[in-house]
Amino acid sequence: MSINIFNPFKDLIFDEQFCFLTGELTTEKMSVYPDWLMDHFKFRDDRIEMMDKSKVYRYGDLQLPCSKRVKDAFETLDETFREAFKKGYETVAALDEHLLFLWTGRMVYGMLYYEMRYENERMMKLRERFDLSPMLRERFANFHLMLQSIVEPVVFVGRKPWSIAVFPLKYSADIFSYRDDTVNLLFQFGVNGFGLIACLQDNGVLGEKQKDILSSLQKSLRMVKK
């Protein structure tokens, strides 16, 4: 039996009545950033700019239309990551990379979704057609397909399509450092205890190149603990 996989980048479909991940009609919503993360680090009311700096949102206002099964799947994932976060670096580092990809990818794609909606609305006001280059359509469509693996039978064969590194990090306070790049699909995240860097669509190239550096970081942590 064939499965129809939703690709919003084929016809640039980003309407609020369709689930961002599966394309199902829905009235449900989920936050771009995990609620527990916004509450713990108190950035729900902070502001974030779109890439061209002309549009500003509150983090807490960023919502994605989603089907119930997608919302449930991400809530389960959030709980897994929240429990690992409480226990610290070693527990987070031991998580399956696929789970780390889904957790980081949800935020990066969420911001990409808002960039697409904003750009579409901006072009409509100018009475111009919103479009993307073939290269970006393919890159974003592949990323979206990978994210669908949280609810659909998407299988990764051979080399992992991402590079993800978790490493020890020490801050002087319980703070939150975060950056993303929606065009290049990059994610950087740091808290007191560990940092996480994800290149979400590089076919594992960066992870292979930085293997020795990450191994040294992890070895240093073990030596300090002895």
Describe the predicted segments one by one:
Residues 22, 34, 67-70, 91-97, ...:
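General structural signal for secondary-structure boundaries
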Residues 19-22, 67, 104, 189, ...:
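Generic structural hydrophobic/aromatic packing signal, biased to beta-strands
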Residues 1-80:
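An N-terminal structural lobe/cap that precedes and organizes the functional/catalytic core
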Residues 41-43, 50-51, 88-90, 126, ...:
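Short, surface-exposed linear patches
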Residues 127-226:
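C-terminal, charged low-complexity interaction regions
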